[in-house]
C-alpha cells in the first residue's frame, strides 16, 4: 500500500471524493513554489501532482508550458525538484506526491538511479505522459517494482479496444482527461464525463480521477460527483503566474477542494 492507496481507502471509508491539485515545481521560483506546496494539504488537497519542468512539454497547454519555462529559466532541475519533495516531506509525511512530466529527464538520469532517488525523496507515484503502455518495460514495470504507483491517462478517444492496455499496469489511480486536446481547455460537462467514467470503472477497481478544464468550485463538485475525484492544474497555475499572494492562491485551492469534497 502506498500513500496514494491509503488516501483513497480513507476517502472511500468516509464517503468523500478526492481532490488532486497540480503545480509546477519551481514556478515562479523555488521558495514560492515550496510555500504553495506546503500549504496545499491545509487547503484540502488530498494528493499533490508536482510538475517536472521540461523543455518540450508537448501535451501541455500554454499555461503549463509557460510555468515550466519560468521554472527552467529560474534554474529548476530534476535534482532541485527532488529536493523540493524532500523539503516538503520534512514537514509532511502523509500527503501523497505524484511527479508528473516527460520521460526524457528520467531517461537521461538513468531509470534505476531515478527510481532510487524518487523513492528516497518521498515520491509516491509517476505520471509520464509520453510513455505508452507498449513501453511499460522502460519505466512502468521498474517503477512498480520500486514501490511507486504508475498512473496512466485515458481520454475520450480511449476506446474499448485500447482500454485494457491502458489499464494493464496502471496503479494508484487512472487520470481521465475529460476533453481531447491540451491542458487548460474548456470546462468538461458531467453529462459527457459520467458515461465514460462508468465505462472505465466497469473494467477496473482503480479509482478514476477526472481533470482538464475545471476552474470553479461548482465544476469541481459536479465533476468529482461522477468520478472518484477531480484534479485542477491550469486554474491554479494561472493564479501563480499572475503573481497572486500565496495566501490567495491557497484560498482559491480551498474553494476548489470544498467543492470536490461536497460531491
Curated annotation (Swiss-Prot):
The keyword Lyase applies. Coiled coil: none annotated. CDD domains: Tryptophan_synthase_alpha. It is an enzyme of class 4 (lyase). One of its GO terms (molecular function) is tryptophan synthase activity. Pfam families: Trp_syntA (PF00290). Its EC number is 4.2.1.20. InterPro entries: Aldolase_TIM (IPR013785), RibuloseP-bd_barrel (IPR011060), Trp_synthase_alpha_AS (IPR018204), Trp_synthase_suA (IPR002028). The active site is at residues 49, 60. It catalyses: (1S,2R)-1-C-(indol-3-yl)glycerol 3-phosphate + L-serine = D-glyceraldehyde 3-phosphate + L-tryptophan + H2O. Transmembrane segments: none annotated. It comes from the Bacteria. One of its GO terms (cellular component) is cytosol. Gene3D superfamilies: Aldolase class I. NCBIfam families: trpA. Tetramer of two alpha and two beta chains. The alpha subunit is responsible for the aldol cleavage of indoleglycerol phosphate to indole and glyceraldehyde 3-phosphate. This is Tryptophan synthase alpha chain. It comes from Jannaschia sp. (strain CCS1).
